Amino acid sequence: MLPEEIIKRPIITEKSMSMIPQKKYTFEVDRRANKIEIKKAVEQLFGVEVEKVWTMNVKPKRKRVGRFEGRTKAWKKAIVKLTDRSKTIEFFDSLI
């Protein structure tokens, strides 16, 4: 898989933004990607050094519209910690 296919989008929440000073960044990633692929993709796309990767599968939630019931899609979340000597990811710096 290409790095652009692995990293889908950044997760911008209050909790994820509070982890940026510790050099932890949160992304939605492809469900088939493993930690090694995620690490390589972040290093290639952003030019940083990754120390550790945590992943979690987010289960779908039930949603109703009137009498019809459906589900949101299941997705995979990755939290990436950069090394101390690594530079920060510029995209997130503009959000703080």
UniProtKB/Swiss-Prot annotation:
Keywords from UniProt, A to Z, are: Ribonucleoprotein, Ribosomal protein, RNA-binding, rRNA-binding
Provide a Gene Ontology MF annotation, just one: structural constituent of ribosome
Please indicate which superkingdom the organism of origin belongs to: Bacteria
One biological process term in Gene Ontology: translation
NCBIfam families per record: PRK05738.2-4
Checking HAMAP family in the record gives: Ribosomal_uL23_B
Q: What is this protein called?
A: Large ribosomal subunit protein uL23
Species? Caldicellulosiruptor bescii (strain ATCC BAA-1888 / DSM 6725 / KCTC 15123 / Z-1320)
The beginning of the lineage is:
Bacteria, Bacillati, Bacillota, Bacillota incertae sedis, Caldicellulosiruptorales
